[in-house]
Amino acid sequence: NKQPATLRAALPNRPLPPPAPSGQRSPWQRRGLGMRLLWPLSQLYRALQAWHARRQRPIHAGVPVIVVGNVIAGGAGKTPVTQAVVTYLQQHGWQPGIVSRGYGRRTTDCRQALPDSPAHEVGDEPALLARTTGAPVFVARQRIEAVQALRAHYPATNIIVSDDGLQHLALARDIELCVFNEDGVGNGWLLPAGPLREPWPRPVTATLYAGQPPQPMGSAPAFALQRRLAPTAYNGLGEHIDLLTLAQQPVEAVAAIARPGAFFAMLQAQGIPLAATQSLPDHADFAHFSRQCGHDTPLLCTEKDARKLWCQHPQAWAVPLQLQLPADFWDLLARELAKLQPTNSPPEHVNATTIGPF
């Protein structure tokens, strides 16, 4: 089993550097006095989570389920992994569908995310996944509801990939992939004294990490992932430009993601001089965004933010992210998939009393 073709070719010989400073170091990276004072609340959080886990009865989707998630608060790079896994499945004869909660949307119902769906209706990541994979994507607070709707509209779907949802225990799963960014597990404490959503290590099928392996590692196989920027960017006017061309002049960059400093560092790694940067809250809608530079300075953003930014600045250049995973990971995934027989049984009926708040 070979690694699937990369989603977009990377610029040569441009490895990702350590993330650029994006403000003060997170207090979750050390066990300082403030975090120690919050530690008792972490123990309460642990007890409540354990109680929640005990009362769950996982509901089966009727087809195999892969969950791509993390155990830390904030972004860890789950969505690019989801995109890569879905592409792999499509290339190997599966017909995958994607479900997500749709973080950042203003709606609360279960609905399909289409390539042109506004982010405020379906969330940033689901719309991006619909555009980049072509797979059907449904969002719902309870992911089993999204599974039911997806399979009703696309009955040929024979495997589900959940973008996030490692803690959504109401949905039974066959494969779990846990993703870490460069911060690893931080100070190793649970919320609010640390970044962990649940105790780590925990059983998963595989761990994927950027930077150094998270410590402690756990018993699951671990694989390093590499992220690079695609060699070309595109704007809302349908135009494309080579990143090497953008490197010939200072640019303005904006990002409304969990770790904007990482995006800015990747631009700098390509030799692109940054005249100004703006870090907005994750999932920000750009309604009040104003430029710091003149309109003759190119404006760059992430692919996730592009559709929202284009409403006011269609000339902004969206820079796609490319993810590469080692061949050993794809071999492991192939072995795990070989254990699963594509089925087409109806999903279990949703009982609202069995579904938790995650």
Where are the regions a protein language model picked out?
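Residue-level signal for inorganic ion chemistry
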Residues: 44, 79, 129, 163, ...
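Phosphate/Mg2+-binding loops and adjacent switch elements
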Residues: 102-218
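Phosphate- and divalent-cation-binding pockets in alpha/beta enzyme and binding domains
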Residues: 75, 146-149, 262-263, 308-309
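Walker A (P-loop) phosphate-binding motif
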Residues: 50-115, 355-356
